[in-house]
Regions:
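DNA polymerase processivity clamps
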Residues: 1-120, 138-252, 264-402
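Flexible hinge/switch segments at interdomain interfaces of large molecular machines
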Residues: 253-259
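Long, charge-dense
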Residues: 122-141
Length: 402
């Protein structure tokens, strides 16, 4: 018989973590491993391994050690803790390997609840292997990791970033100069310099990564995210909660070279246009769109916005901001000053969502801004970089040839 006691404070933590884990990504199978005064919990799904440890106030076993490990479903464990303790009292846990069951007992009231062990008791070697899996994988894959520090201070920023990333992910067909083209996967990522440190991850930090980060921010003051150089796997770690997890990321359908950071993502010899304008001028340009389309917000699902940066327009010191959808069209002129234009007469149009521009303008502090976009040669698609003067916000958008 294996016995150990979880104090009330740690019961609350386990309830919180087990409840939150369901929001992270379908974590369904924990293994609890009482050993050396700690309770280690490992959660598994097809793509994620998550583990965290909780100090236990007492540990007693009559076993030799090889069968001190058992598994239950996360729902079953959480519900049992709630039934027996409600986080107010210590809980005694007894693992009966002979009868294949685990019993939770409230040490104050004596209330008992017994459960069958889910998926049978596992051996010491199997349990140890699962405990070290996260560290082993991190050591193997993170030779030169990309590190992202996320704190509660930047959670609001990630909310904005998620909206922008979600807006530009579409497979809808659009018409470009009489021809039909499809969005492969427009990526917009913003880096705001608060307590966030990002190197070459911008074009890869898609919505899936944000969605994985968001639940963690509810239960930890600081989260460290390590990404493999190819951005295929993300490792999450929280020191104050003591948990780690692994997330397998889908590779973007369109991305810049993996060995380049955002500033160097586009070749230096590529064409470049640098335009200066003001935030107020760009905001003023949105007025006709708001007036034209405010009666049919659902039409924003089929948006096409051109920042027409053709040579003639730039020569006249303007951008033409053009909006088209199934309900109509509208145009506005944005006064600009051309700082540099190496694209010449054949430069194309920058395709940017109006809502994305509005989101960008909402989070930059300065009125004057510089937008720089470089072209990445391709048969149908250019990459473009928008960099705002404050140096606190960067975005990567897709540009199409005319």
């Amino acid at each position: 018989m294996t016995k150990f006691t979880i104090n009330s404070e740690n019961v609350k933590r386990l309830q919180t973590l087990s409840g939150q884990s369901k929001d992270l990504i379908s974590l369904t199978k924990p293994i609890f491993c009482p050993s050396d005064g700690n309770l280690s919990v490992n959660l598994y799904s097809n793509r994620v391994t998550m583990s965290f440890s909780v100090d236990i106030s007492a540990f007693e076993t009559t076993d030799t050690g090889e069968l001190n490990y058992f598994s239950m479903s996360i729902d079953e464990f959480n519900n049992t803790l709630a039934t027996v303790s409600n986080g107010e009292n210590d809980v005694l846990v007894e693992v009966d390997k002979d009868n294949n069951k685990v019993t939770f007992k409230n040490n104050t009231t004596g209330t008992k609840v017994s459960r069958a062990v889910y998926n049978a008791i596992v051996t010491l070697d199997e349990a140890k292997a699962s405990v070290t899996a996260v560290d082993d994988m991190r050591d193997e894959y993170l030779k030169d990791p990309v590190t992202l520090k996320v704190t509660n201070e930047v959670s609001e920023f990630f909310e904005t970033a998620s909206k922008i990333m979600g807006l530009l992910k579409t497979q809808d067909a659009i018409s470009l100069n009489g021809t039909s083209a499809r969005y492969a996967d427009q990526l917009v990522v913003i880096n705001k310099t608060l307590s966030t440190s990002v190197s070459n991850t911008e074009v890869h930090l898609k919505r899936q990564l944000y969605e994985a980060i968001k639940p963690f921010l509810k239960i930890t003051s600081e989260l460290t995210v390590y990404l493999t150089p190819d951005f295929s796997i993300a490792f999450f770690e929280s020191k104050d909660l003591g948990f780690k997890s692994i997330l397998s990321l889908e590779k973007p359908k369109f991305a810049y070279p993996e060995d380049s950071d955002l500033e160097g993502a586009l070749p230096q010899e590529s064409s470049q246009v640098i335009v200066k304008t003001t935030k107020s001028a760009l905001k003023d340009a949105f007025i006709p769109f708001n007036n034209t389309f405010k009666a049919s917000p659902e039409s924003w699902n089929w948006k096409k916005t051109d920042l027409d940066s053709s040579a003639n327009n730039l020569a006249e010191g303007k951008w033409v901001l053009r909006y088209e959808n199934y309900t109509g069209s509208a145009e506005s002129v944005v006064p600009v000053t051309v700082v540099q234009n190496t694209e010449g007469a054949n430069n194309g149009k920058l395709i940017v969502s109006i809502m994305v521009l509005e989101e960008l303008l909402n989070i930059i502090p300065e009125d004057d801004l510089t937008i720089t976009y470089n072209s990445l040669p391709s048969d149908t698609m250019y990459g473009a970089l928008m960099k705002l003067d404050s140096d606190t916000v960067k975005a990567c958008v897709t540009k199409y040839k005319p």
